[in-house]
Swiss-Prot record:
Catalytic activity reported: 5-[(5-phospho-1-deoxy-D-ribulos-1-ylimino)methylamino]-1-(5-phospho-beta-D-ribosyl)imidazole-4-carboxamide + L-glutamine = D-erythro-1-(imidazol-4-yl)glycerol 3-phosphate + 5-amino-1-(5-phospho-beta-D-ribosyl)imidazole-4-carboxamide + L-glutamate + H(+)
Extent of the signal sequence: none
GO biological process, one term: L-histidine biosynthetic process
An example Gene Ontology CC term for this record: cytoplasm
Designated name of the protein: Imidazole glycerol phosphate synthase subunit HisF
Length: 267
């Protein structure tokens, strides 16, 4: 039975962690490599870096961060943000990323997913889907793809797009509810379930985690294969080890071996 994965996520801008992290003993809370080391020691199954730097000039900084993180950490690393070409994917993989997440570029050109998957293998390619519910109350649920941090509507149905990019060769889908993101009110379980039911590739639930029960629900109710969270880990509400124990107690298959530091940050 495949184990459910817990994936902390770090937003990186201009080479620094945005929204910071609070870890005891961390020399530099703004250094993504230092934060990654903590999550690696804590037993995170994977780590996700999302680069929200606007300028292309800063890509060299991101590649350096990926390289230093890959050297220092054992856990798999997914990197996304600003990926526009097959060459961008190649550069990140060469720097040490295990997977590359494609967002806006996949919406503009779904065949980019096919080209990247053909060249590097589907297991390396994640498509990040940012969606908002657009159906009126009482109507069948429907979600639209938004790009550029949830600002720009596309008119594209999220579930249909998920099917398309899975067929194009995406090995995994990172599904974020823009309605729920930052609310700490739990994942949009209907969105997660609709997409996980529509595709055969793994789905990562993202956006809205407020507590450990939300992680359980993402899998048990949303059908996700992995759960992504940020604030509950960054700010010390729970450790990765506590999250794994809670999910295992709920009957989910978790990887409990290996490093499992229960240390967490002061609130």
């Amino acid at each position: 039975m495949l184990k459910t994965r817990i994936i902390p996520c770090l937003d990186v801008k201009d080479g620094r962690v945005v929204k910071g992290v609070r870890f005891e003993g961390l020399r530099d809370a703004g250094d993504p490599v230092e934060a990654a080391k903590v999550y690696d020691a804590a037993g995170a199954d994977e780590l996700c870096f999302l680069d929200i730097t606007a300028s292309r000039e800063a890509r060299g900084t991101l590649l350096d961060i990926v390289s230093r993180t890959a050297e220092a950490c054992f856990m798999p690393l997914t990197v996304g943000g600003g990926v526009r070409t097959v060459e961008d994917v190649r550069a990140l993989l060469l720097a040490g990323a295990d997977k590359v997440a494609i967002n806006t570029a996949a919406v503009k050109d779904p065949d980019l997913v096919a080209r990247a998957a053909e060249k590097f293998g589907a297991q390396c390619i994640v498509v990040a889907i940012d969606a908002k519910r657009v159906s009126p109350p009482g109507a069948p649920a429907a979600w639209e793809i938004f790009t550029h941090g949830g600002r720009d509507p596309t008119g594209i149905d999220a579930v249909a797009f998920a099917r398309l990019v899975a067929e194009k060769g995406a090995g995994e889908l990172l599904v974020t509810s823009m309605d729920k993101d930052g609310t700490r009110s739990g994942y949009d379980l209907a969105l997660t379930r609709a997409i996980s039911d529509a595709v055969t590739v793994p789905v990562i639930a993202s956006g809205g985690v407020g507590g450990l029960d939300d992680l359980v629900a993402g899998v048990a109710e949303g059908g996700a294969s992995a759960v992504l969270a940020a604030s509950i880990f960054h700010f010390g509400q729970a450790s990765v080890a506590e999250a794994k124990a809670h999910m295992a107690a709920a009957g989910l298959a978790m990887r409990l071996d290996g490093p499992a530091s229960s240390a967490r940050a002061p609130l």
